[in-house]
Amino acid sequence: MSLSRQDIQRLLEEYQLLNDLLASLQAQHATVSELVEELSTALDGVRLLKSEGGERLVHIGAGIFVGGVFEGREVLTPLGAGYYAFLDLENAERIVKERLEEYSKVKTSLEENIEKLTERALQIRQVLERLGLR
């Protein structure tokens, strides 16, 4: 394999750029994964509130639960951009479900991009290793 000095320099630059981009995408993926998990928990909570009767244990954070009978049929729901509104359980469920679907798509897209960039970085690394540069 005969590569010019410029070709090698471009490969090194692309390899570094890919690694930087991968680090950024992996951080985004971690954030989106947390949001998906949080939305799944919220959706389960709204569905639990929709079911009738009895005392409930509700997670309030840090592994702490509070018990009680919940008679309210509305929940304070984030609408985006820092705005909240009291919504009936049906609409709250719909909004949380839509957000969960959106973030799940973003997560899948990030995973696909990470996979493609990882493959390209591996190809470049193999070329650089054959040239004795990595």
Curated annotation (Swiss-Prot):
Gene3D superfamilies: 1.10.287.370. InterPro entries: PFD_alpha_archaea, Prefoldin, Prefoldin_subunit_alpha. GO terms for molecular function: unfolded protein binding. Signal peptide: none annotated. Keywords: Chaperone, Cytoplasm. One of its GO terms (cellular component) is prefoldin complex. Its main location: cytoplasm. The keyword Chaperone applies. NCBIfam families: prefoldin subunit alpha. Molecular chaperone capable of stabilizing a range of proteins. Seems to fulfill an ATP-independent, HSP70-like function in archaeal de novo protein folding. This is Prefoldin subunit alpha. It comes from Pyrobaculum calidifontis (strain DSM 21063 / JCM 11548 / VA1).
